[in-house]
Amino acid sequence: MTRKQATIAVRSGLNDDEQYGCVVPPIHLSSTYNFTGFNEPRAHDYSRRGNPTRDVVQRALAELEGGAGAVLTNTGMSAILLVTTVFLKPGDLLVAPHDCYGGSYRLFDSLAKRGCYRVQFVDQSDEQALRAALAEKPKLVLVESPGNPLLRVVDIAKICGLAREAGAISVVDNTFLSPALQNPLALGADLVLHSCTKYLNGHSDVVAGVVIAKDPATVTELAWWANNIGVTGSAFDSYLLLRGLRTLSPRMEVAQRNALAIVEYLKTQPLVKKLYHPSLPENQGHEIAARQQKGFGAMLSFELDGDEQTLRRFLSGLSLFTLAESLGGVESLISHAATMTHAGMAPEARAAAGISETLLRISTGIEDGEDLIADLENGFRAANEE
């Protein structure tokens, strides 16, 4: 029987404990495991290489994304670093989105300057620019869709197809939607990665990442390197992640419903100069999103019509939206891209990506939607006070 996403998330690892019959899989905190005899190791010998709790959540994540296997890492950035470590060597070219996550941009730019590989940041919605970059025969193409923070959507199937024709490996960062709303491997990607810190865990109490591959041999290679460079996820984070994963589908449903209501509210506000969400017909890639996604998601961003003082007054008027980085938790968060999530980008790079100084990003939580809109109303009221 082919299981649906919600069933996979809830049932993964249940009733697997043959020793005690635990319904919920136990947490295995031991760092090392004894041998049964001389030169007779068990299935696990050291937790950096393999851990029973991590095994369970890796199987769950692989099944959710339709992959051959998964490698859990200790952060989302470790997942990105693992992919570039495995597939890029000096002289190889990485093609990445011009508006990618600020942490990814900083990592790629820094390692390229050290000669680890070359990187080219491209507007992947511009087919001519993308084809020009692919003509240089990159080894790896990274896709983010929807993009961070402007929620631009690109055609994953098309980009992965073009990458394959160019001989490149395609990897999609699916953090903003989760497998509940998008499955890049089914769209032609070779790899998919997540910051598990976000929607997959959903409670802002785990830092982890994952790489999921379509090919079993690639999974083996990724796992080998993850062990070697010491980026595998911990048992405790694996346990919390698996617990959070069980409510992924209902969390995404409520958060997305709240986001759509907030978008409708923000459309009526005079202080909102620009609004970004894939549900909007004018949003870049709206038609693509309707085709390749199972929902428009719970992330949105908007530009305030004003200066820094307007921004400060607006934020000071909020009480339910927490001013913090990250996203995907049950609580609603708001962040200022230029000084927070994308502070690692040079001002000219932010400008080229369309990230203004008054851009705010919202990660919609699962609070009551009417309360969230009332809180935004308080923010706009404060912003209008001189």
Q: What are the residue ranges of the model-derived segments?
A:
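Positively charged, small/polar-rich N-terminal and surface patches that mediate targeting and assembly
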Residues: 1-6, 12-14, 52, 274, ...
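N-terminal glycine-rich, Lys/His-bearing helix-loop that initiates the first secondary-structure elements
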Residues: 1-44, 385
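Glycine-rich, charged/polar anion/phosphate-binding loops
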Residues: 8-16, 194, 227, 259-262, ...
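Conserved PLP-enzyme active-site core in the AAT-like
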Residues: 11, 70-269, 276
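Conserved N-terminal alpha-helix of the aminotransferase class I/II PLP-enzyme fold
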Residues: 32-81, 103-110
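PLP-dependent enzyme catalytic core of the Aspartate aminotransferase-like
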Residues: 109-110, 118-120, 132, 136, ...
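A common structural junction motif
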Residues: 229-230, 318-328, 379-386
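Conserved C-terminal alpha-helix-loop-beta "cap" of PLP-dependent enzymes
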Residues: 274-360, 364
